[in-house]
Amino acid sequence: MLMSMGFVVAAFYRFVHLHNYYDMRSVILEFCQEHGIKGTVILAEQGINATISGERDAINKFFSFLDLDHRLADMKYHESYSSRLPFSKMKVRLKKEVVRLGIDDFDCSSMRGEYVDPKAWNDLITKPGMHVIDTRNDYEIKFGRFKHSINPGTTSFREFPDWARKWAEGKDKDVGVAMYCTGGIRCEKSTAFLKSLGFENVYHLKGGILNYLQSVKGADSLWEGDCFVFDERVAVDNNIAPSEDIKCVKCFGKVDEADLRSVSKGHIVCGACKSADVS
């Protein structure tokens, strides 16, 4: 079973006002270091966004630790598993935004699109005339996507607003738009931005691709390929297990675990090809 793989990977976010987020950094970092937890936590005045990994007991204790702060209590998170820690360090970063859209003072709290449960997602995206937009970056989409979804071709989420403005030109604002991303946080902002352009029927996949893969299995799934993740697993399969189908972009051969620890934006190169490039 996947749960016997040894390490739990937990991804979560919450938009909530954290006026003291600067002070929270050292407290969270110290707790994680004491419990052998590694990963990345982003703190901003507008909330928290994180993916962490550790042994089961350590992860349970971490969320009990978050419960001590009423703003972060009862945190919902997506869980997957790995045979090794998929992070080499524990980082707690302070940012202006928990996910960078590139528009100063853009408030998504009152405009975000309508959440759609994974069980209802298939019916939504197969409706005639529904526009399905993948809000992730191009290098993520290459690993997998929902069939017939629109790829904005971005290299950074900050490029999404410019793409959306151009895409929206001349379109009927009453059309249906369904949006998705890895864990849901980018869609909180991208759906709100699309609504700010005048679109009314805007939806997004609740909990993102990871939640969908947990909820919709086998022949019922409309997901094709793997799902890129921002850790040393690089991608997970339909069972949210580390993908065994990751190949070198140059020779298409197998890539060792050591080479997966230095992947930049999905550009995977095996050791042999790296050596050939240097020589």
From Swiss-Prot:
GO molecular function: oxidoreductase activity, acting on paired donors, with incorporation or reduction of molecular oxygen
Residues in Rhodanese domain copies: 126-221
Endpoints of the signal sequence: none
EC number(s) recorded for this UniProt protein: 1.14.-.-
Record-level GO BP terms: tRNA modification
Catalytic reactions of this protein: uridine(34) in tRNA + AH2 + O2 = 5-hydroxyuridine(34) in tRNA + A + H2O
InterPro entries per record: Rhodanese-like_dom, Rhodanese-like_dom_sf, TrhO, TRHO_N
Residues annotated as catalytic: C181
A matching Pfam family: Rhodanese
Domain of life of the organism encoding this protein: Bacteria
UniProt entry keywords in alphabetical sequence: Oxidoreductase, tRNA processing
Enzyme class: oxidoreductase
Keyword Lipid biosynthesis: no
Protein family according to the UniProt entry: Belongs to the TrhO family.
NCBIfam families in UniProt: PRK00142.1-4
Database matches in HAMAP family: TrhO (MF_00469)
PANTHER family for the chain: RHODANESE-LIKE DOMAIN-CONTAINING PROTEIN 7-RELATED (PTHR43268:SF3), THIOSULFATE SULFURTRANSFERASE/RHODANESE-LIKE DOMAIN-CONTAINING PROTEIN 2 (PTHR43268)
Function according to Swiss-Prot or TrEMBL: Catalyzes oxygen-dependent 5-hydroxyuridine (ho5U) modification at position 34 in tRNAs.
Protein name according to UniProt: tRNA uridine(34) hydroxylase
Native species: Anaplasma phagocytophilum (strain HZ)
Name of the coding gene: trhO
